[in-house]
Amino acid sequence: MIGDSCEDKFTYGTSHRLCPDTPAPVFLPNRDIINFGMAGNVYENLKGFDLKCDLITNSEKIVKQRFIDEKTNHTFLRVDIGDKVNRAGFNPTDIQKQDYEAIVIADYGKGFLTEDDISILCSINDSVFLDTKKTIGPWCKKAAFIKINTPEFEAIKDRIDTRDWVDKLIVTLGDKGCMFMKKEGFNYYPTKKVDVFDLSGAGDTFQAGLVAKYLETKDIRQSIKFANDCAARAVQKKGVVSSL
């Protein structure tokens, strides 16, 4: 597991009035819940699936703090601290193919991994699962599977040759599930309808479920369906979920 990680801090409280000098709610914090976020959340989810894994991530601290109404789960505000980190302090070529059954990359674009770093990682293992905020291109064509979300796909769909991403590209569609690029076009994988309570970390849970099931079955269709189910369960719970 390689990528940018953070501390996900959820501050739950109440708000019953507006500030008298400005139209803003007065928030009274009651409790904090702190989780390992971003690549750290994928890592915790992978361990939750009983996978043995290592984590390579940033040493600098990134904090995402959300102020949330205890009763309604409405988020009043998110405050990000330390949004950028230094480049990874390791040489990607030091990771040997025989050491790992798969490499999972969660690239949140905070500066920990460059395109060159990811390209090297993709070339040294046949099972690289990439989730990236970068614009996909030749640098990541050797990844086994690449997951991006709908806004990221919409931003690039007119600038890429979809034939380059056959049997590789997975686009998540929120509550509609996801789609997987095939030679004849996208295959759609709908998800079951659930009551959405919190979207935090759902993509991380999807990625971990995808990896876990694929390592078990080597069947990407089964893996996508399982990942959809994992994400659907995650959004029904408060905060970042690392154990289903």
Regions found by a protein language model. Name each.
Residues 2-3, 149:
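A secondary-structure boundary/capping signal
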Residues 4-5, 108, 205:
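Active-site metal-binding loops of divalent metal-dependent hydrolases
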Residues 16-22, 67-82, 102-161, 177:
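Conserved beta-alpha-beta core of the PfkB/ribokinase-like small-molecule kinase fold
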Residues 7-105, 115-117:
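Conserved N-terminal subdomain of the carbohydrate kinase-like
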Residues 31-38, 109-113, 145, 152, ...:
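Catalytic cores of large soluble enzymes that bind and process phosphate-bearing ligands
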Residues 98-99, 116-142, 155-244:
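Conserved phosphate-binding/catalytic region of the ribokinase-like
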Residues 53, 145-150, 187-190:
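Short hydrophobic/aromatic-enriched beta-strand-loop microsegments
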Residues 3, 47, 57, 132, ...:
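Short beta-strand/turn micro-motifs composed of small residues
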